[in-house]
Amino acid sequence: MLKNQVSIIIAVYRDVVALDLILKALKNQTYKKFEVIIAEDGQSEEMKEFIDTVNDLTIKHLSQEDIGWRKNKMLNKAIIESSCDYLIFIDGDCVPHEKFIEEHYNRRKNNFVLCGRRTEPGEKFSTLLREGKISIDMFFTSYLKNYFHLKKDEIRHYEEGIYCKQNSILEKLITIKSSRKEAHIVGCNWSCNKEDILKINGFDEDFELPTTGEDTDIERRMRHFGIKMISCRNFAIMTHLHHKKNFNHYTKQLLPQPSEAQK
């Protein structure tokens, strides 16, 4: 039996359909020696029931009470539970290309963080993926051919979904271009050695609202310890699934509510 070398940590919240697509994509990865840690910032019965049905993957499912945005706390638990020396972090609404893990693992270096990005198709293509009318493999293999359809669908960051093969001319061109532009952590797609993130004591759990700088914070602290950022854009690629962004659920739990007299 192959010994796992990589822990894939997936931060999830309620979106079972997206997780299903992610796990299907993980089953089709070219690199096989990995475990999956599902870090659920909540305790959805639907999520648990679905995960219990999944076969052919080594999965650890961690959850916690749904009392506000506590993603960082959940990620710290996942780091502790991981059994591998190399960690890849992805979000639960982002589906990886079949070579995603292979690219992260083969490009790893000591004292470096690999920083990737994501492409963001609009509602039409995201719905096709969610409904199973196209697979993630079909999405990426026809990516260039569907350029105009994707643009019509108001895709964002189209260039981030172009996969670059190893040792190709395109790889050399992109590597040169990437070296001119400093890499930064985006929480949906990055990886590091486990010892490096333990060195900085993991994620700061004082961040209790999304998009408030938790990615920037962990990058800043890693740089302080001499850990450098390197780009894996166009090598470890993934696509985001379109959804409405609504943070009211979290702000209502954090902000004091007006009394009856104040209403």
Predicted segments, located by residue:
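Cell-envelope/extracellular polymer assembly enzymes that use nucleotide-activated donors
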Residues: 5-7, 35, 217
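Short, acidic, metal-binding catalytic loop of nucleotide-sugar glycosyltransferases
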Residues: 24-33
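A conserved acidic beta->alpha catalytic loop
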Residues: 32, 40-49, 94
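Glycine-rich, basic loop-to-helix element that forms the pyrophosphate-binding segment
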Residues: 65-82, 99
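Short aromatic/hydrophobic "clamp" motif used to bind/position activated sugar donors
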Residues: 87
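Conserved donor NDP-sugar-binding/catalytic core segment of glycosyltransferases
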Residues: 99-153
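Short, flexible, basic/aromatic active-site loop/helix in glycosyltransferases
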Residues: 135-182
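A short, conserved alpha-helix in the catalytic core of glycosyltransferases
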Residues: 184-192, 196-201, 208-227
